[in-house]
Amino acid sequence: MPHIRMPRRALLAGAFALTLTAGGATGTAVAATAAGAAPAAAAPHPPAAAPHPPYGLRLDGAGECTFPMKKQIEDRPWALQRLLLDELWAQTKGKDKSGASVRVAVIDTGVDRANPQLSGAIDVGAGKDFVDPKGGDGTTDTIGHGTKVAGLIAARPQQGTGFVGLAPDATIIPIRQNDGQGKGNALSLSQAIDHAVARGAQVINISQDTDVQLSADSELGKSVQKAVAANIVVVASAGNDGMSGQKRKTYPAAFPGVLAVGASDRNNERAVFSQPGDFIGVAAPGVDMVSTVPGFGQCIDNGTSFSAPYVAGVAALLRAEHGDWSAQQIVWQIQNTAERAVNGRDDYVGWGVVDPVRALSQDQQAPKAPVPDPGPPPATAPQAAALQLTETAQERQERYGTYALGIGAVLIAVIAGTATVVRDARSRRRRLQ
């Protein structure tokens, strides 16, 4: 079963666990354990000495998703085969017209810089570690989750593999905020977002979520709004609890201004695990996703965790190409050019499955808010044929004309016949005389 998120729990100082929205039959699966955790406290100011609940996140590695890998995945991944990369990168690969690289903050488990596809993509000086008490630059990744997320955005081309990031000239700001062992919570995520804003991020990717219903005036909500107000495209995964089909909001994806991303499969349909809800903005490939792992090589994984960076990569390309567009316009462009299965949006894939090439090629005008397609015009109702019970005046005139012609023909024939008889009779009389 792909990814089980942790239920609501009481956490220290109102902070709660955020689950990494990845996992599946192949690759890394995420599960939550919370033995003995207490119900959520209602007191606005929990005691400072409250014990840290014994919750944790368990990552169950499977198949080839171990690291470092000894071999690379040679083939072009299916999520890239559906694209014409030359057309996608016709204008930019992640650098703006001045040559500056678009800055994408990856708030996750860290981003490993040893993988050669990422070593040249990371701004180490801008990174930060919110997990290790000693601090750090955000390039420690003991889980591999953040390294995979970053690779989908900005992995550089490398000989021996067909995998490459969607914006291979973009720059990654590595922010380690979750270690997969319960240390990632709303408070640290709020701090990580603030750090991304301070370090000049133009796009922020968040591949984790909680179903605790948060308000906009929560610490996390305030930090998200600060990022949105700073004209940053904030992309977040919707979560992987969609197997039941139950619709519910997850955060930070459901905050206003955030582009919430669900997962689609190879048929451009919602992946069975992708969380549905009225907050879904778009969907993107999230099944059998190839990306970088710590050390060397690539692996395959599943989850909305890997749909979000696919969209973040497109956002980075658009930011590079259209520096005059606002973050909201970037989001609208992604939504307007998505491939739709219905005329408008739905709660499963939002405005549709992201089409990167279309987003970068149908960009001649500044985008507006998405609206439903008009659809085909209504068909004209069939009308019964008129039934004539009597003849029309024209038909009557035509009938009279036919009669006149017939009578005339008969008269001519009679006259001609009479003339012939008279002529023959006269001829006989002459012979008898």
List the predicted regions and their residue ranges.
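Subtilisin-like peptidase catalytic core
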Residues: 132-214, 265, 341-343
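Substrate-binding/access-modulating region of protease and related hydrolase catalytic domains
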Residues: 177-251, 297-302
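C-terminal segment of classical bacterial N-terminal signal peptides
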Residues: 20-32
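C-terminal membrane-anchoring or membrane-association module
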Residues: 407-433
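Active-site-adjacent substrate-recognition loops and nearby beta-strands
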Residues: 237-258, 262-279, 291-303, 343-349
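C-terminal subdomain of the subtilisin-like protease fold in secreted/lumenal serine endopeptidases
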Residues: 272, 322-417
